[in-house]
Design a protein with these regions (language model features):
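A structural signal for short hydrophobic beta-strand segments in well-ordered beta-sheet cores
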Residues: 165-168
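A short, Trp-centered hydrophobic/proline-enriched beta-strand micro-motif
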Residues: 142-151
Length: 399
């Protein structure tokens, strides 16, 4: 893949029109945290038919699994069945949509991306049929919003080794205690996927088994903290979660077994990290695109010493570097799309490298955009300062 297809461009242009009509007029309220993002992402899904597509997809998946379990047939291997390849055929349109939105508000992307790509996806890959039936239909249409809770105050990059949130067996149930922080959708989530260590008396606390549970808001002992005030991404509520003897029945343990066939919670999370880090590259591309567009327009409109500033070599060099960054990140995204079409995914190491380069490139481009705008770049009305704040979050986000 070396360029966007005609279908991708149609999706991009349709998304651009939606943004101009439905999001830009409310951007100040969203970015200040005054407006909730959830009505906007639900409107987006409704407008593009994504809610209907999600409902149909989950219905078909559940019907297939019911039939398979009734006949006791083994599920097909994802790679041999071509599932990834089928996804890849449509992924470029999704990337076109997301990158366009990223140039305006990566917080909105994070809001639905975490709910679907991490919360619902974990239930989909690790849950039993009954668990999928219980939670996925409402999550896949955004009727309900999910959070995905791994990070803790003392366990960020060392997410599993330093994890202190734990469960201990209490009869047939589990009691959950601990704290999570920096949790996207945490303050408002209806459903929360929580990773916790099993306190089984093992002396090596770092190596204890990690289990994955699903909680619903309002459960006794669960406290969802208020949204943090952040440097950027204010359109995505982020907060803390507190667990004080939250009683969890066995049907809330994903897979309903402590010995999951796909490994423990560590393996589940690592699989999600690949998608999350590639997603950072897509958002980085959107920020770079928007910075470049704004800077080119400004360089044509702004005059100094009787000349458009775009005629000065220093400005031309800045714009050229932005274009190089755009090409590099776009090529990484395109390469990933090609691999997906071929039925493969990047390794965790490759996804991490893509994430590191693209987020750093987006941050450098956005900071150069602020500098190119000069004093105006420091003012909120010109938007490049928001892009700089959002871009910096991508260097931290997703590890």
């Amino acid at each position: 893949m070396i360029e966007w297809s005609d279908s991708d461009i149609i999706v991009r242009d349709t998304m651009r029109a939606f943004i101009d009509k439905e999001i830009r007029p409310h951007l100040d309220g969203l970015e200040s945290g005054e407006l909730s993002p959830y009505p906007f992402v639900r409107k987006l899904f409704s407008e593009f038919g994504l809610d209907v597509m999600g409902a149909e997809a989950i219905r078909a998946m559940l019907d297939e699994q019911r039939a398979r379990e009734a006949s006791r047939a083994e599920p097909e291997d994802e790679k041999t069945s071509g599932t990834l390849g089928k996804m890849g055929a449509q992924a470029s349109m999704a990337v076109a949509l997301i990158s366009e939105l990223a140039g305006v508000s990566i917080g909105l992307i994070s809001t639905f991306g975490v709910s679907l790509g991490l919360g619902a996806a974990t239930i989909m890959t690790r849950g039993t049929l009954a668990q999928k039936e219980r939670w996925l239909p409402e999550l896949m249409t955004l009727e309900k919003i999910a959070a995905w809770a791994i990070t803790e105050p003392d366990a960020g990059s060392d997410a599993f080794g330093g994890m202190k949130t734990h469960v201990r067996r209490d009869g047939a149930d589990y009691l959950l205690n601990g704290q999570k922080t920096f949790i996207t959708n945490g303050p408002d989530a209806d459903v929360i996927v929580v990773y916790a260590k099993l306190d089984d008396g093992e002396a090596d606390k770092r190596g204890r088994k990690v289990l994955t549970f699903v909680l619903d808001s309002g459960m006794p002992g669960l406290t969802q903290g208020k949204a943090f005030k952040k440097m950027g991404m204010m359109s995505s509520p982020t907060g803390e979660l507190f667990f004080d003897d939250v009683r969890l029945s066995p049907d809330r343990l994903l897979g309903e077994t402590e010995h999951h066939s796909s490994g423990d919670g560590r393996d589940s999370a690592r699989a999600n990290f690949v998608a999350e880090r590639v997603g950072v590259a897509v958002m980085s591309l959107g920020i770079i695109d928007e910075c470049l567009r704004l800077c080119v327009d400004y360089a044509k409109a702004r005059t100094l010493w009787g000349k458009e500033i775009g005629r000065f070599q220093l400005i031309q060099l800045k714009l050229a570097k932005m274009e190089v960054a755009r090409m590099n990140v776009q090529n990484m995204v395109f390469q990933t799309l090609e691999r997906l079409k071929a039925g493969t995914l990047p390794s965790l190491g490759e996804a991490s490298a893509i994430k590191w380069y693209s987020s750093e490139a987006a941050t450098e481009v956005a900071m150069d955009a602020v500098q190119l705008f000069g004093g105006n770049g420091y003012m909120t009305e010109y938007r490049v300062e928001q892009l700089a704040r959002d871009a910096k979050s991508l260097m931290i986000y997703a590890g």
